[in-house]
Amino acid sequence: MTDVTVKSLAEEIQTSVDRLVQQFADAGIKKTETDFVSQKEKEALLAHLNREQGGSAGKPDKLTLQRKTRSTLNVSGTDGKSKPVAVEVRKKRTYVNRDAVEQAKAEEQAKREAEEQARREAEEKAQREAEAAAKKLVEEQAKREAEEKAKREAAEKAKRQAAESEKVTNQHTEHKQKPAQTDKTIQSEKARREAEAADLKRKAEEEMRRKVEEEAKRVAEEARRMAEENQDKWSSDSDSIDSDDYHVTTSRHARAAEDENDAKVEGDRRARGRSGKATRQKKNNKHSESKADREEARAVGRTKGKQRKTSTLQQSFNKPVAAVNRDVVIGETITVAELANKMAVKGSQVIKAMMKMGAMATINQVIDQETAQLVAEEMGHKVILRRENELEEALMSDRDTGEAVAEPRAPVVTIMGHVDHGKTSLLDYIRSTKVASGEAGGITQHIGAYHVETDSGMITFLDTPGHAAFTSMRARGAKATDIVVLVVAADDGVMPQTIEAIQHAKAASVPVVVAVNKIDKPEADPDRVKSELSQHGVQPEEWGGETQFINVSAKAGIGIDELLDAILLQAEVLELKAVRSGMASGVVIESFLDKGRGPVATVLVQEGTLNKGDIVLCGFEYGRVRAMRDELGREVFSAGPSIPVEILGLSNVPAAGDEATVVRDEKKAREVALYRQGKFREVKLARQQKSKLENMFANMEEGEVSELNIVLKSDVQGSCEAIREALEQLSTDEVKVKIIGSGVGGITETDATLAAASNAIILGFNVRADASARRVVENESLDLRYYSVIYSLIDEVKQAMSGMLAPEYKQQIMGLAEVRDVFKSPKFGAIAGCMVTEGTIKRNNPIRVLRDNVVIYEGELESLRRFKDDVNEVRNGMECGIGVKNYNDVRVGDMIEVFEIIEVKRSIA
């Protein structure tokens, strides 16, 4: 190993140079900062440091290492969105010195053996002492009895000797006479005394044996009592030994639960063991069979007396025998995987259930709430439908609506009618301005919102387009209005858009005031207008109805005051009121993207007061009102009910018809707007997927359908919606209009790139392309078209679609010839001699051979001759010879029909 300097070594081990030099000095090695350090010197320094830290005293018994690993995991939630979740994996590993552990176990074992030996010695000593005491007691008793017996025998002997001596003295003569009889008496007396002594000895031995047995019983009783008193201590020691064998977890609570489970299992085994069912139990539980045997075999060695302790480990899991019905909470949309997770079943089962119900889905497909409810109920679960707009409801409830005192407000009047019937001109005269001249083509293409002051009060007018493409804009105007003024030209009568306006007014339950315009024209016929409108449910007051009819002339100014009076009279009948104080709410009439000001929305305030600086939640968009302007472009700072204003400051262009609401918290408004965007997208995708799957067989033929891709940009949101709807209605079975992208504002480079990628044409309605977009258009040779009138746009799209239609081919009969005779030719076979009866017979045209007006062959001419000369055509009334290619069965009387196929150009109706 290469030697290193002291300085580099200090940097390597992350310590100061001075400290390292001092440690070398303490180890007996003198070093400076620039000196080299060899491997031996490093080992010497390490040994010195180990000695200082007590490393030589012995190795540590236990070493614990911890490691943390951090990562990020994307987890999908209940709303279907992926959220990054930080995951930290903590690993802990403990290394144990086996020598120390074995030594500790050996010491513990020796200690337990010593205690057991001491206990046994104590029992043996107590037993020996009891036996010695009993033996000593028996010996003393026997000694006392022997002494007493000896005294009694001595006294009796003395007494007998005295009696005998007296008897001997008195009967000396008799003894002398009978010596043989005296010897016999002495022997019998001696035998009697020996028998009495043996009997006394036997009785003493029996007494001693009885006392020894009683003492042994007493000692055994004391030993049993001692064992009962120390049983808890000894069993706890034994359990601590056994716990190392069958505890497989380190948690205290888990060990307690495991002990309870084992005790329960042991109780069941003892109850079943007597009936001989333990074997079947062991076979039924495959998980515990081998381990239970090992535990029982291990427990045999610990058996004491008649007590047995077995500890078995088995995982008691029983398969559910009945279906589990769950409460499934379903939001507005849910994926198939989430639905399966809530029902605790596999995703494949949910897909099978949906296929049985006639719906096809994939595991990650988003389905709507209704479909999910049907599937869950079909599978036997209880469904709880959840509304996921709690945040939105909380935000809407936290609004200051003031004291809720309703005050009279100005009526909102919508002017409807057929195109060119004079709606805008009538409004111009009322406002004394010239708005109609500013509209392209003289037709209204936006919703104009104006409020005018009259002598009788203020009136807010909404001018809607009359063109058929602006149906949604007229419907939107009817929803936001109080009174509809239906303008009908006296010289034109009721037209399709007039009927449509009546339907919108009836659907919105809005009263109608009919203004019969162009009354100054000579061909005007007001009675005809009344008659035609009465056929559609609009009855004039003169005929017993409820609708006011006012004859007006927008150019001459006839009947304008009467019309305003009729409007105000109708407003008085309606008793229109609104709350002026508090937070405002209204509806978006129109919206567009201004290049200098950003998103601009025309809002009609319906309740409250809209102030500059308020936070507005408008459909999918939100923002703070940075500026407000009236219809004349003047800046205003507040707007009350029935006042239309343009507001600036929204995050994007809102959709026309969205409800605009003032809220308190901008942060919550942003959350609600984002939630609405996501939910709208999910619901839209769910519906699209559902329609695609339901029309699966129809979609198989889509590859044969031509598509006209369009990128559409408009100046305002309402016009964009109207054009989009009109273009989509142009689609046919053969050519479909596909709107690749649409929006409000100028044509940008992004739009041009999108059109290039999708092979689409770019349509601009009252907008222009910027420089970068024009550059992309030139480089990619894209089709870019500008329009200012909707008629021209729709007509040109129709022409483009007509060019994409498959051509239609038509057969046109050129001539007819009758076969008069048949000749044989070695070169062409059968030659038909014919007379041309109609038209002209031309060479190389397809022909048909007819027999009895039935086509029997279709082919082409091979030879056409007149007087043995080849000719190109034969006119009517002339004879010729015709050779049919690959056909020789020509007969007299057949008709030969010559035709040609012409292409017919198709167009979109």
Swiss-Prot record:
Residues 408-577 form the tr-type G domain. Signal peptide: none annotated. Residues 463-466 are annotated as: G3. Residues 517-520 are annotated as: G4. It is found in: Cytoplasm. Residues 49-314 are annotated as: Disordered. Keywords: Cytoplasm, GTP-binding, Initiation factor, Nucleotide-binding, Protein biosynthesis. GTP binds at residues 417-424, 463-467, 517-520. InterPro entries: DNA-bd_dom_put_sf, EF-G-like_DII, EFTu-like_2, IF2_assoc_dom_bac, IF2_II, IF2_N, P-loop_NTPase, Small_GTP-bd. Its main location: cytoplasm. GO terms for molecular function: GTP binding; GTPase activity; guanosine tetraphosphate binding; translation initiation factor activity. GO terms for cellular component: cytosol. PANTHER family: TR-TYPE G DOMAIN-CONTAINING PROTEIN (PTHR43381:SF5), TRANSLATION INITIATION FACTOR IF-2-RELATED (PTHR43381). NCBIfam families: IF-2, small_GTP. This is Translation initiation factor IF-2. It comes from Photorhabdus laumondii subsp. laumondii (strain DSM 15139 / CIP 105565 / TT01) (Photorhabdus luminescens subsp. laumondii). The gene is infB.
